[in-house]
C-alpha cells in the first residue's frame, strides 16, 4: 500500500523510502486521518438521528481531507464502474452478528483505529476512500447493530445499506447459527439483490475451531451469499473482505443481465424458510461433516464474481 502525499523531489524521495520500508509488512499500514462519527446510544436519539434521509445526509458529510489511500495494485480484476455508488457517492456497509464475534474489530481495522483512547473516541462509524481495481470508492462501515440492546435498531439497519457483512466466530457454533438466522431475516426484509458476505472471523484460533470451512461455504451456498474467513487479530483477509464488498456492489449495479439472472434464480430456489429449517437442522446433527457434499460450490468464496 502506498500513501499519496509529499511534494517536490524531497517528497518523492521520502515517499520512495517509506514504500521500501513497508514493502515486507502488512499492506494496510498507518491509516490516513479519518472523519469519525459517534452514534448516539439512546434509542430516542438513534431514532432522531436515523430518520429517513438523515442518515444519507450524515454519510454525505465532509470526509477525509488529506492523503488518499491507495491499496496494492495486485488486486484481482472485476467489473468496475465510473460513477456507480449510492446516491451520495458513499457505499454504506453494515456489520452484523452475535456479540463477541469480532465485527467491531474488523470495522476498526478498516477505519485504522484499533487500540487505546483513539479507538474509544472513534465512535461507531468509519469512512474511508479506497482504490479497488484502479477506481476509488468511498465506504462507510456502520458498527451500530447492538447499541440499543433491543430490536428497533437492527430492524432499521436491515432496511437500509448497500451491503451487509454478517460475522460469526469459527470458535462458536451458536454465533454461526445466529449468522444464518440473520441472513434469512435480512433477505426477508430486503427483497433486492443486496450483497451479503458471510464472514468467519478468528480463523487464527485453529485449536478452538467449532465451525469448519466447509460448513461456512455450505451455508453461503444455501443462502446465496459470499463467504470469507478472516482473522482480526492477524489482519488476515480483512483487506480482501472490504475490497470484496466494493466489487460485489459494483458487479450488481453494473451487470445488465442481473434482472434476468435474479428472476431465473427465484424460480429455482426453494423458500428461504424451508432452507433455513433444513440447514439449521443439519448443523446440529452429529454427522455435520457431510454438509460439504450437500451443495456444489458456485464460487461463493470468490468475492470478485457474482
Swiss-Prot record:
The modification Omega-N-methylarginine is found at residue 23. One of its GO terms (molecular function) is GTPase activity. Residues 56-88 have a biased composition (Low complexity). The modification Phosphoserine is found at residue 25. It is found in: Cell membrane. Residues 1-13 have a biased composition (Gly residues). Residues 1-91 are annotated as: Disordered. GO terms for cellular component: plasma membrane; T-tubule. May regulate basal voltage-dependent L-type Ca(2+) currents and be required for beta-adrenergic augmentation of Ca(2+) influx in cardiomyocytes, thereby regulating increases in heart rate and contractile force. May play an important role in cardiac antiarrhythmia via the strong suppression of voltage-dependent L-type Ca(2+) currents. Regulates voltage-gated L-type calcium channel subunit alpha-1C trafficking to the cell membrane. Inhibits cardiac hypertrophy through the calmodulin-dependent kinase II (CaMKII) pathway. Inhibits phosphorylation and activation of CAMK2D. This is GTP-binding protein RAD. The gene is Rrad.
Amino acid at each position: 500500500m502506498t500513501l499519496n502525499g509529499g511534494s517536490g523531489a524531497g517528497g518523492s524521495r521520502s515517499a520512495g523510502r517509506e514504500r521500501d520500508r513497508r514493502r515486507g509488512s502488512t499492506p494496510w499500514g498507518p491509516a490516513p486521518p479519518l472523519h469519525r462519527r459517534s452514534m448516539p446510544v439512546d434509542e430516542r436519539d438513534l431514532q432522531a438521528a436515523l430518520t429517513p434521509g438523515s442518515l444519507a445526509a450524515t454519510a454525505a458529510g465532509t470526509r477525509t481531507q488529506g492523503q488518499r489511500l491507495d491499496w496494492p495494485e495486485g488486486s484481482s480484476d472485476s467489473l468496475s464502474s465510473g460513477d456507480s455508488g449510492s446516491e451520495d457517492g458513499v457505499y454504506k456497509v453494515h456489520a452484523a452478528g452475535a456479540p463477541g464475534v469480532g465485527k467491531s474489530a474488523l470495522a476498526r481495522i478498516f477505519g485504522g483505529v484499533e487500540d487505546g483512547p483513539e479507538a474509544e473516541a472513534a465512535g461507531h462509524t468509519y469512512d474511508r476512500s479506497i482504490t479497488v481495481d484502479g477506481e476509488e470508492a468511498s465506504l462507510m462501515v456502520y458498527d451500530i447493530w447492538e447499541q440499543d440492546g433491543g430490536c428497533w435498531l437492527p430492524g432499521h439497519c436491515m432496511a437500509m445499506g448497500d451491503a451487509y457483512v454478517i460475522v460469526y466466530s469459527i470458535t462458536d457454533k451458536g454465533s454461526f447459527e445466529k449468522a444464518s438466522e440473520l441472513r434469512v431475516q435480512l433477505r426477508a426484509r430486503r427483497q433486492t439483490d443486496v450483497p451479503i458476505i458471510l464472514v468467519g472471523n478468528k480463523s487464527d484460533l485453529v485449536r478452538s475451531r467449532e465451525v469448519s470451512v466447509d460448513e461456512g461455504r455450505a451455508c453461503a451456498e444455501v443462502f446465496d451469499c459470499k463467504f470469507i474467513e478472516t482473522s482480526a487479530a492477524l489482519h488476515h483477509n480483512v483487506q480482501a473482505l472490504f475490497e470484496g464488498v466494493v466489487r460485489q456492489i459494483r458487479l450488481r449495479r453494473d451487470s445488465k443481465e442481473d434482472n434476468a439472472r435474479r428472476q431465473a434464480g427465484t424460480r429455482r430456489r426453494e423458500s428461504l424458510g424451508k432452507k433455513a429449517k433444513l440447514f439449521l437442522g443439519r448443523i446440529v446433527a452429529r454427522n455435520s461433516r457431510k454438509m460439504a457434499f450437500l451443495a456444489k460450490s458456485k464460487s461463493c468464496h470468490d468475492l470478485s464474481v457474482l
